[in-house]
Amino acid sequence: MPQNIAPPGLISLLAAALAQQPTKPLVLALDGRCGSGKTTLANTLARQFPASITLHTDDFYQPPAQRIRGWEKTPCANMDLARLRDEALRPAYEGQPVQYRAYSCREGAYLPARELAAQPLVILEGSYSHHPLLTGCETLRVFLTCAKEEQTRRLQAREGERYANFAARWVPLEEGYFAQYHIAETADFVVDTTQSGTI
């Protein structure tokens, strides 16, 4: 079972691990419920550890033409996790430079190539970052969660008029993924961000 941890404790844990100068980069994967603060925590950690790179699962959506029929009902079917693993996560885990092109759903196109130098800390953040396809390229898995009421409040503030569609479409897919792969139960640590000011 995972242990509960607060962000300051996670920072201390990472600092201690990096102080040992491991031979391979430390890859921290932040998964969890939408609205739980994955991106916020990733940004906090990136500021705390400048010698790091951050990878976002949101950069690895599949173009609509490549998605399987019925993808809207299948968790993760709109993601290209194999490309994330092969082009970004595995090279970063092996201490190699990373080069990849993010796919922008807003623009409907791949963006210019992004090049990242090898760093001792790699932060992978976003939904599906604990997916079994990525097993073997991660050192530490942290699951973020918050109370349902707080999640609703945050998503309403974030999504505005798009909230109803977001809640009906994406939240069930995400919860299905958590249940199918026991994501919360198999994490190393859990961060509960329900209380304001947690991250």
Segments (PLM) and residue ranges:
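ATP-dependent NMP and nucleoside kinases share a basic, alpha-helical "lid"
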Residues: 109-158
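Conserved lysine of the Walker
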Residues: 38
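P-loop (Walker A) phosphate-binding loop of NTP-binding proteins
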Residues: 33
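Hydrophobic positions on the alpha1 helix immediately C-terminal to the Walker A/P-loop
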Residues: 41
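Short beta-strand-centered segment that lines the nucleotide-binding/catalytic pocket of NTP-utilizing
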Residues: 51-65
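Extreme N-terminal, non-catalytic leader segments
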Residues: 1-28
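Small-molecule kinase domains that catalyze NTP-dependent phosphoryl transfer to phosphate-bearing small molecules
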Residues: 109, 113, 131, 161-199
